[in-house]
Amino acid sequence: MDDHKNGADALFILLGAIMILAMHAGFAFLELGTVRKKNQVNALVKILADFAVSTIVYFFIGYYVAYGVSFFAGAETLAQKSGFELVKFFFLLTFAAAIPAIISGGIAERSKFNPQLAATAVLVGLVYPFFEGIAWNGHLGVQAWLAATFGAEFHDFAGSIVVHAVGGWIALPAVLLLGARRGRYSKEGAVAAHPPSNIPFLALGAWILTVGWFGFNVMSAQTLDKMNGLVAMNSLMAMAGGTLVALLMGKNDPGFAYNGPLAGLVAVCAGSDLMHPLGALATGGIAGAIFVWMFTRTQNKWKIDDVLGVWPLHGLCGLWGGLAAGIFGLQALGGRGGVSFMSQLLGSLMGIAIAAIGGWIVYGALKAAVGIRLDPEQEFEGADLAIHKISSTAERETSW
């Protein structure tokens, strides 16, 4: 019986890992469709390379930092319980690799390639798993203190804070240290529009992410006996709420329309196992509003050139999601209970503080040591030709 359960659980979490692996194609196409044509190849290569670096670093360092588990044992030992511990690593790796994928969208079109891979190694090896261990493995006694003080631990079922807010708040200092793209803002304060280069690819990326997100959220149960359809229903409602509010506030702009469902899904991750579907709908709708309002404000008023809006989308909507779990997760508002708003507030603030400080240190050190921005000539030429020596489409065909 145990063998059947182990096999079923291993398959369950493996399918989740594969769905989230596919989400990285979504990250790539969302960025490809948003950046200008001369930076499309770079978007594709960067996401793939970041995932490969994340895999190696998380295998040797990050997973041990978060969970105290290493894989330096014989294959026979590793294969026990149908290899469940191995596919659990694969599943959690796909979460860790989302950190550089999120950052990539913010620093697009002007960041150096190799320094970003170095940043990925440090962030996935140390910064991300440090907070992951606190939130999901009880490190430093923070969860025990919150439970003793406020009656419940910090609850983040699928990573509104641990993954999305951390990624978004690491990206913010990276974007600020890089500075705006060449020609984005004039000395007089005027804003030069850089519209998406390919709306169909942007939409494709958003759809891939949206579909994969149901693996991201539902499979966070990690075993079949803990799986609950409430998570899927709440994810669906948050997606719908985020879409409609972003569509309305964005005045039918397709960029806002297709980021709306992502905003809702980011926010519902933390409390998707606790909320009533109506609470999830409200959480997603508010997230859609946060994204549209803050994206416009950061770009036009504060002159922060966050290309894909990853700080509003992941950083702020993720922060809202951590807090929303402590609101709509309460039994008084139709939730399942077992959550404290104060624990959610303190846990969320701790997560974004660790992320922001870690981001400043990592990108600040790289900027001082080797530089993190392309030369003006390279930026003007585009990252595709400057870094990869090829464009996304041939300028001309050669016939013999």
Annotate each PLM feature.
Residues M1-W400:
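Hydrophobic alpha-helical transmembrane bundles of multi-pass membrane proteins
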